[in-house]
């Protein structure tokens, strides 16, 4: 398997110029790519992703530019991409603290490594190219697109809902998701202003933390780099720990 970390980001109609904290999350991934055994970062966008995947289902282009629809487009892309190439997928709201060797090392023993038992969290996973579960996920997404023609697809239908039906596939391992995301998403907004966030949510062995952009308040998405630098919100605490330069 190749030591590649894949990411995808496309600006939505709501944030046509991007989201500053997402840029900083990307920088945290880049910052640690020479740590440990190292990894290469390939970050895709709406202009270049077609260079990396084949046989794109034409119905994917019926999805609109809303954040909800772009999330579904990213679900389709990540499945196709990692099936073809293998490596690690990280959503763009991941803040990386250290080397990712502990994740890559899982691929010495399994075809697929992910988080959350019974329903894989697709915001972060690792796999070999041509992994059996990835083939099933890709095929199921094509089935969903062909039947819907890319219209009225609900959130997660091509993501965790699509892959979770294949969790009994041999040679996969699903780990405890709280190892990398210990915030209850239902109450994420309550934790943004914790002053002791590192102590509460991060341990020394943790490779990254997933912020879950869909649940981040709009006013925080509008914070500039300068505002994030001097803020003590949870995102800023994590970015500082990651070593990002604002």
Over which residues does each language-model region extend?
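Small-residue hinge/turn detector
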Residues: 75-87
């Amino acid at each position: 398997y190749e030591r590649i970390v894949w990411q995808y980001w496309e600006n939505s109609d709501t944030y046509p110029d991007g989201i500053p904290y997402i840029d900083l999350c990307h920088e945290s991934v880049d910052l640690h790519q020479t740590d440990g055994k190292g990894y290469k970062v390939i970050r895709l966008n709406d202009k270049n992703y077609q260079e990396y995947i084949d046989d794109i289902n034409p119905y994917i282009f019926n999805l609109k530019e809303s954040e909800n629809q772009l999330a579904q487009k990213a679900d389709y892309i990540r499945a196709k991409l990692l099936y073809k190439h293998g490596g690690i997928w990280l959503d763009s709201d991941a803040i990386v603290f250290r080397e990712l060797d502990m994740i890559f090392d899982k691929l010495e023993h399994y075809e697929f490594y992910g988080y959350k038992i019974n329903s894989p969290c697709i915001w972060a996973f690792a796999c070999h190219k041509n992994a059996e579960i990835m083939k099933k996920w890709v095929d199921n997404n094509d089935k969903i697109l062909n039947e819907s023609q890319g219209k009225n697809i609900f959130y997660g239908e091509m993501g965790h809902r699509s892959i979770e039906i294949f969790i009994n596939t041999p040679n996969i391992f699903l780990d405890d998701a709280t190892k990398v995301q210990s915030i209850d998403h239902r109450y994420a907004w309550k934790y943004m202003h914790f002053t002791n966030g590192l102590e509460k949510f991060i341990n020394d062995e943790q490779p990254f933390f997933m912020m879950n952009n869909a649940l981040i308040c709009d006013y925080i998405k509008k914070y500039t780099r300068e505002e994030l630098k001097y803020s003590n919100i949870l995102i800023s605490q994590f970015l500082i720990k990651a070593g990002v330069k604002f």
